[in-house]
A protein has these predicted regions:
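Short acidic active-site motifs
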Residues: 11, 84-88, 157
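Conserved P-loop
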Residues: 18-92
Length: 205
């Protein structure tokens, strides 16, 4: 972890490089998708092929289309049910991807959380992803949606996410600035990094 934090500065890319499983959670519009797209672009040019799974929308294709050569080693797809996401992840275990990106990993669980089998399916999904990371060396990057309370912001299914992900970042707003804060592993002084978003993705400040 030391190479990812120097003089109190949070070095996102270095932390992601050395961590098998990374999660970015935050409120809608905070910049989670842009962070994942930027990391995917930079990682997969060197360590492809990669699979990027969207469970919400396809607006990111416009940004990808403007940098199509930078995403030459990334396959994009969409799924819109928890069952289909599980099926896709199982099939991925037979493929040769180096990195799997899921944006977002808990949105489909949130949609069916009232169903009796949803927690079991979500737990199975998380366990299988962890297993692929440990046995096959597959890097897992994901975002998570949150529910906003009066005093705090917490991702749906956070207890499971915290258990299965090695490195967790909170993405949010501080006054007029966007930030990424390291939540796990925990530190006495919480490292934080500010960023902006332009037409190509995230620019770290």
């Amino acid at each position: 972890l030391g190479i990812g934090i120097r003089s109190g500065q949070l070095r996102i890319y270095e932390l992601v490089l050395k961590s098998p499983t990374c999660l970015f959670y935050g409120v809608a519009g905070a910049g989670k998708t842009n962070i994942l797209l930027t990391l995917t672009r930079d990682l997969c040019k060197k360590d492809g092929p990669c699979l990027y799974v969207s469970t919400e929308e396809t607006l990111h294709y416009e940004k990808v289309g403007r940098q199509v050569e930078d995403y030459a080693y990334t396959l994009f797809t969409e799924v819109y049910s928890l069952d289909k996401l599980l099926e896709l992840v199982f099939h991925t275990s037979y493929m040769n991807f180096q990195t799997l990106v899921v944006d977002s990993i808990n949105s489909l669980y949130r949609a069916v959380a009232y169903e009796e089998s949803s927690l079991a399916k979500f737990t199975l999904l998380m366990g299988f992803l962890r297993n692929m990371s440990e046995l096959k060396g597959l890097k897992i990057l994901a975002s998570a949606q949150v529910r906003a309370g009066e005093e705090d912001v917490e991702a749906s299914g956070m207890s499971l996410l915290d258990y299965y992900f090695d490195t967790i970042f909170q993405v949010g707003f501080e006054k007029n600035k966007r930030f990424v804060k390291l939540v796990k592993p925990r530190h006495k002084a919480t490292p934080i990094k500010y960023f902006e978003i332009n037409e190509k993705g995230v620019v770290w400040m």
